[in-house]
Amino acid sequence: MQKDNTPNLAIPSLGLALIPIILTIALLGVQIFYYDDFTPHIALAIGFAITALVGWSQGYRWKDIESGAFHVLHVAMPSIATLIVVGMLVSTWIASGTVPMLIFYGLELIDPSWFLAASMLLCSVVSLSIGSSWTTVGTVGLALIGIGSAFGVPIYWSAGAVVSGAFFGDKISPLSDTTNLAAAVTETNVFDHIRNMMPTTIPAMVIAFVIYLIVGGQTDVDTAQLAQIAQFKEGLSSHFDLGILPLIPLIVVMALAFFKVSPIPALFTGFILGAIVAAVNYDYNLNQVLTFAHSGFKISTDTASLDSLLNRGGVSSMTWVITLMMFALAFGGALERTRCLESVVRSILRLTKGFRGLQTSAILTSVATNVVSGDVYLSIALPGRMYGPEYSKHGYSRLNLSRAIEEGGTLVSPLIPWNAGGAFVIGTLGLTVVSGDYSALLYIPLAFACWLSPVIGIIYAQTGWFSKRSDEDVMSTQPDSENSSQPQSLKGNI
């Protein structure tokens, strides 16, 4: 969050603050649903311009609004750089045989009937261990997409399971940046914060796991599918080294992530190691490796479906995603700088009454900030900063708030295509969206764990279950009284 350097300027009225938000959402809706065109970039740029006009009407100078956009872009530069490095890493990990090896042995070891459930669990464990959903999606997740393709599982189902696991593991990892941010902005202990998320985390994970098991159990691998799996394995084994050497880049990246090395140097190290293994194993020269890193890996295995899976990666594959992120972040930065977001949140706070309203509003504010700003960090920091005093005022622990903003922030981020998280998922997993075919975006409702958690959180908010008083060490499992403004002892604690 940036510091407001113009404290004398008034916060815009709610009606004025909503103008750029409503018009931008309307423009996006017309473009996507009426004209069947999923290229939100220019609509977001127009939204930025409308926000600038609103700011100008309130006395903001252009350089104030510009600095707001640049500030958010500056904060997001590590995420943008991560996207670039992941594009480079994907191409060299395919060229080196790292991804093909994971796909090959995955086809050997994983049964199609429990592939989806296993994908979610594996990504959860990896993300929990290293604290990075993005690294998990870009490495293990990419291989799982390949395995699912061989099994005949639609890419949106595989992506839904990968996203569910990767972002859920990130949510409850003490190594995660968003987990630590949620704890820091609400002034709570990170381990207390993680424990307090279990009442929503466990049910959401269990429900998602059961759904994936049921769906996977209905998967029938017929003769044609068995033939395709055999073709995949034959193509992989005949074109790639499936020994121990291609595993080195993955092991090193996982180790660096576990020891909390920043994602960019960790992933760049993986890219370099992948390039070295590719050069050693397959005699690629320097120019070929650099071409892979820029334009993506290219190969012909005589199996079209395998070729489409392996011919990907490179910096150029991320340009659409990166520009989308930049437009969305600039729009969000302008909304924050002109205090439009603050105006909306303050208006919501004036209408909230009791714990039910407070907790529900906090979750929905995080979700809305994710949608409007495209920035997961802002979706955690803004409501965390603005709702915190209200929780303290009414005698509720800020652990309730930290749970709310994590659910509406971290978990919803990958479900919004123009958000940093959603853009990364789409770009990395190859979820191609073309006019008239939005099937790739079906991963959004199929990432069950990501949206079930905030839904369960809202249910708890409405019932008062698992609400925590500021002076209590345990959580209530009984409904809260809406009419009392003073903290009261809650019964039925566990």
Question: How should these model regions be labeled?
Answer:
Residues 35-50, 158-184, 223-251, 333-335, ...:
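Alpha-helical transmembrane segments and their immediate interhelical/interface regions
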Residues 86, 90-91, 95, 211-217, ...:
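C-terminal TM-helix exit segments that contain a strictly Trp-centered aromatic cap at the helix terminus
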Residues 405-417:
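A late C-terminal transmembrane helix in Major Facilitator Superfamily
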Residues 33, 171-174, 183-234, 393, ...:
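Juxtamembrane and boundary regions of transmembrane helices in multi-pass small-molecule transporters
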Residues 59-149, 302-389:
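Membrane-embedded alpha-helical segments and adjacent helix-loop junctions characteristic
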Residues 111-203, 366-407, 432:
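Hydrophobic transmembrane alpha-helices that form the pore/transport pathway of multi-pass ion
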Residues 1-82, 199-207, 216-324, 476-494:
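Hydrophobic transmembrane alpha-helices of multi-pass small-molecule transporters
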Residues 20, 24, 43, 47, ...:
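Alpha-helical transmembrane segments in multi-pass membrane proteins
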